[in-house]
A protein has these predicted regions:
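Cytosolic catalytic headpiece
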Residues: 1-166, 173-174
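Short, hinge-like loop/turn segments at secondary-structure boundaries
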Residues: 55, 105-110, 179, 198, ...
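Non-transmembrane, extramembrane segments of multi-pass ion/lipid transporters
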Residues: 125-128, 153, 173, 183-216
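Short, well-ordered beta-strand core segments
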Residues: 137, 178-180, 194-195
Length: 216
């Protein structure tokens, strides 16, 4: 956006106002909310068909902030998985502020957050070291998620990945065990090996225990 609406007036989006906008977004992110900016284009009388080229000189009119809280069973499931020796890692496209808040809510200690732009510039050897030292990865693209899982597998880990969105499809396919939920998007469910029908994530713990008992 090039302009912002304030007090029913459209004014230029100056550096000072832009900083205020970003501060508001950061505050909302810190509360675990994802934020979408809403802008409109004024003076459109002469435009018959709209295209990407028209998405400029727009007026910021507000935000949409929405919360996607973790499942109530998430914290207990993570504790139990760790107790059974499962190394729990977060791979997400969300930014680091939202991710920190969610990790705090589920009781997962964050020792370090590795961002997608840093993953991109790492060699496979560097990433191989980083995946052992890092338990939270944020702002990841679908291919970056898949690459991290591939590196973990190459290090000898058996990797399970749980996801329910379009951006999780590649990672679900790459993992040794791809896990989705019955409310996930079609491509995620099609890419998964297992689809959870129960709402409680404790079923993951039950699966680990049952799988190990089969090997005894």
């Amino acid at each position: 956006s090039s302009y912002v609406e304030m007090n029913n007036k459209v004014v230029k989006l100056t550096d000072e106002l832009k900083e205020k906008v970003l501060n508001t977004v950061n505050d909302l992110n810190a509360e675990g909310m994802r934020v979408i900016g809403v802008a409109q284009k004024n003076n459109i009388e002469d435009i018959i068909e709209f295209g990407v080229k028209d998405e400029k000189d727009m007026v910021l009119i507000g935000y949409i902030a929405f919360l996607d809280p973790p499942k109530e069973s998430a914290a207990e499931a993570i504790r139990e998985l760790i107790k059974y020796g499962v190394d729990v890692k977060i791979l997400t496209g969300d930014n680091d502020s939202v991710t920190k808040k969610v990790c705090k809510e589920v009781g997962l200690d964050v020792n370090y957050i590795l961002l997608g732009n840093n993953v991109d510039i790492m060699s496979d050897e560097e990433l191989s070291i980083a995946v052992d030292e890092t338990n939270v990865f944020a702002k990841l693209s679908p291919l970056q998620k898949s690459r991290i899982i591939k590196v973990l597998k190459e290090k000898g880990h058996v990797v399970g990945f749980m996801g329910d969105g379009i951006n999780d499809a590649a990672a679900l396919k790459e993992a040794d065990v791809g896990i989705s939920v019955d409310t996930g998007v079609d491509i995620a469910k099609e890419s998964a090996d297992i689809i959870l029908l129960e709402k409680s994530l404790m079923v993951l713990v039950d699966g680990v225990k049952e799988g190990r008992s089969c090997l005894l």
